[in-house]
Amino acid sequence: AMRPVFEQQRPVFVHADELAQIRHALGLAERFELRLVIVGGADAWRMPELLRQRGVPVIVAGVHELPRRRDDDVDTPFRLPARLAQAGVQYCISRVGGERSASNERNLPYEAATAAAHGLAPEEALKAISLHAARILGADDRLGSLQPGRLASFIVTDGDPLETTTRIERL
């Protein structure tokens, strides 16, 4: 069951928010030669160069969060995707964990919109909840973008999908 992990055919997803947790995960991945994906990554903005150099993607688990520290700017979580994008770190935006996480998936476009309002280009915000996620999961050859031969679920809206007033017209 673990062979694909140790042969680097499958990544290891590690939930790590704090800087020390991320560093520890990076150390373990290096020691055991594992493909690593950081899930959460609240402090990833503090070490983007290292994440980029090691090719470690980050699944940003919630843009709509409070800052981790009292002295962090209030918009620190909102700016995390833009900071990772600017540093060249592979990332996506998701909602992770909790007893109501599935019902909160409907808020994913709002999280992308918040990231767009705080420095992430709107097109990148849409990719952060589609193509980038598929790429991190190794499924971008069949999911994440509208191309011939790929699986797709998509929506038709009456406006910008990143606007809270936009309505879905068709699924």
Give residue spans per PLM region.
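Conserved strand-to-helix beginnings and helix N-cap segments that scaffold or border functional pockets
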Residues: 26, 105-109, 168
